[in-house]
């Protein structure tokens, strides 16, 4: 008799995605991050759901409702810190996942890659709106500064900002709508994840060599299920350690002060995972130019497949491209550091240099070095 998992209409889909899926035999730990992101999303949706049961999206009570969750709700502090630090874990996994895609040439699966860029943008929007909800000083001023950037758009900018705010400043209407969108977007993200996987399973997974692996495939279960479970345990251990030992390590002390429109914090900055983009924004003196650079710093990923000039897919056998890739990583770490520093010498010039190098590396250096490596193959 045929196994029910292969015949049942619903179980068949799960079976073909998680059990009998043919996978390349050479996948390294870098292929764990997709499933880790799934776990992060599940943790965020679950903790967020329970937090939403106690949170109130009103300027008068939002800050106090978060305090109430931490002090009075059973294990409310665990929920709150799991949600806040879970977001950090989410972005660590996201950036490593994107980095893996860049290094091993996974972007040649253009549909999967483009849906991935959509996912990254949606998660970033969700995280930004979530940071506004506790209604601390950095929540309020972060929301004010970032939404105000839209006023740089010619003609419609000012009207657009006031439309998003629901008034003439960040206020009750803004908080309420941000809560509504923050609740809704993760479910849209979950739907996009399904589309992402649908496109991925059309082509099959890439592998570290970048060479087609059709002749050498193994079933996903048990080989990669056990590998993924090890990844889950490692990540959840790290998250638990962060939540239980140092929950405020990645947060901002200013957010423990209730929002006050009359008092601006000395250094307005977003959460650490947006600092690289914030540094690029600040490094351009012109407002509209800064906004365009900010948007391009993420959307540049969409043109990476067009810039692939190498005859090889993966960087595994391309040492010169590897050097440039790790230079890019160093540039992004520098930008993250600069984004958290005050706007003064020498930080401004370091940020401007790193921003220029970021775009030059992706747009010019990498394609040129790939062409050079193609010529070296003929030696």
UniProtKB/Swiss-Prot annotation:
One of its GO terms (molecular function) is metal ion binding. It is a multi-pass membrane protein. The cytochrome bc1 complex contains 11 subunits: 3 respiratory subunits (MT-CYB, CYC1 and UQCRFS1), 2 core proteins (UQCRC1 and UQCRC2) and 6 low-molecular weight proteins (UQCRH/QCR6, UQCRB/QCR7, UQCRQ/QCR8, UQCR10/QCR9, UQCR11/QCR10 and a cleavage product of UQCRFS1). This cytochrome bc1 complex then forms a dimer. Heme b b566 binds at residues 97, 196. The gene is MT-CYB. InterPro entries: Cyt_b/b6_C, Cyt_b/b6_C_sf, Cyt_b/b6_N, Cytb/b6-like_sf, Cytochrome_b, Cytochrome_b_C_euk/bac, Cytochrome_b_N_euk/bac, Di-haem_cyt_TM. Binds 2 heme b groups non-covalently. Coiled coil: none annotated. The lineage of its organism: Eukaryota, Metazoa, Chordata, Craniata, Vertebrata. Its main location: mitochondrion. The keyword Transcription does not apply. GO terms for cellular component: mitochondrial inner membrane; respiratory chain complex III. One of its GO terms (biological process) is mitochondrial electron transport, ubiquinol to cytochrome c. Belongs to the cytochrome b family. This is Cytochrome b. It comes from Leptonycteris curasoae (Southern long-nosed bat). It is found in: Mitochondrion inner membrane. Keywords: Electron transport, Heme, Iron, Membrane, Metal-binding, Mitochondrion, Mitochondrion inner membrane, Respiratory chain, Transmembrane, Transmembrane helix, Transport, Ubiquinone. The chain crosses the membrane at residues 33-53, 77-98, 113-133, 178-198, 226-246, 288-308, 320-340, 347-367.
